[in-house]
Design a protein with these regions (language model features):
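Condensing-enzyme catalytic core mediating Claisen C-C bond formation in acyl metabolism
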Residues: 1-64, 68, 72, 166-167
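Short glycine/serine- and small hydrophobic-enriched flexible loop segments
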Residues: 10, 75-76, 135-136
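A generic, residue-level signal for flexible/boundary positions that often mark functional hotspots
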Residues: 16, 26, 49, 56, ...
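Claisen-condensing/thiolase-fold acyl-transfer catalytic domains that form or cleave C-C bonds
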Residues: 67, 71, 89-167
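Stable alpha-helical structural segments in soluble proteins, enriched in small hydrophobic residues
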Residues: 73-81
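Short, surface-exposed connector motifs at secondary-structure boundaries
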Residues: 82-87
C-alpha cells in the first residue's frame, strides 16, 4: 500500500500553522520498519528476492506505542499553546487502523464526532492518510477551525501539528 498527498500552501496574513512537534525513538525500529532500501540495502533484484521491501511490524507493540505516543504528543502541543482538547474542532489522525484512531480519540477525550476518519474507503495510504482525509472532509472544515493532526510511523517516529483552518 502506498499513497501520496499534496497540500498547497499560500501566503496569508492569518496564522495557519500554530505549532508542530516531531519525535522519534530508534529503539522502535525492530517493531515497525522496512529493512530494504536506503543506503544500507539499496534497490536491487536481490532486494526483491529477499523480501526486504515489505513493512514488518509487531502489531501489539505498535498498537500500544502508537496510542500512547500520539495521545501524549497531542496533549503536549495543546498545553504548550494554552489550548485544551475542548478547543479542538477536528482531530485528524493518521489513518493506519480504526482501533488506534478510536483509542487516540478516547485517550485525549475528544468529543465524539470530532475525529475525521476515512480509512474505511482507502485503507492505510501511508504518508497520504492525513492530507487525503483533510481533502475528503473539506466541506466540514470552516474558517477558524482548530485542527489537531497526529501520526505515528516506522522507527518509531510520531508527531502532532496544530493548525488554524484559514480557508
Amino acid at each position: 500500500v502506498a499513497g501520496a498527498g499534496v497540500v498547497l500552501l499560500e501566503p496569508t496574513n492569518e496564522e495557519g500553522i500554530l505549532d508542530a512537534l516531531l519525535l522519534s525513538n530508534g529503539t522502535g525500529k525492530e517493531f515497525l520498519n522496512i529493512e530494504g532500501g536506503g543506503s544500507l540495502y539499496p534497490a536491487s533484484s536481490q532486494l526483491l528476492v529477499d523480501e526486504k521491501r515489505y513493512i514488518k511490524q509487531d502489531g501489539k507493540v505498535v498498537f500500544k506505542n502508537a496510542i500512547q505516543s500520539m495521545s501524549d504528543t497531542c496533549l503536549n502541543v495543546l498545553k504548550r499553546n494554552d489550548f485544551t482538547v475542548e478547543n479542538v474542532n477536528w482531530l485528524v489522525p493518521h489513518q493506519a487502523n480504526k482501533r488506534i484512531i478510536d483509542a487516540v480519540g478516547n485517550e485525549i477525550n475528544i468529543e465524539e464526532g470530532k475525529t475525521l476518519v476515512n480509512i474505511e474507503h482507502y485503507g492505510n495510504t501511508i504518508a497520504a492518510t492525513i492530507p487525503l482525509c483533510m481533502w475528503e472532509n473539506t466541506s466540514k472544515l470552516k474558517k477558524g477551525d482548530l485542527l489537531m493532526l497526529t501520526a505515528f510511523g516506522a522507527g518509531f517516529s510520531w508527531g502532532a501539528s496544530l493548525l488554524r483552518w484559514t480557508i
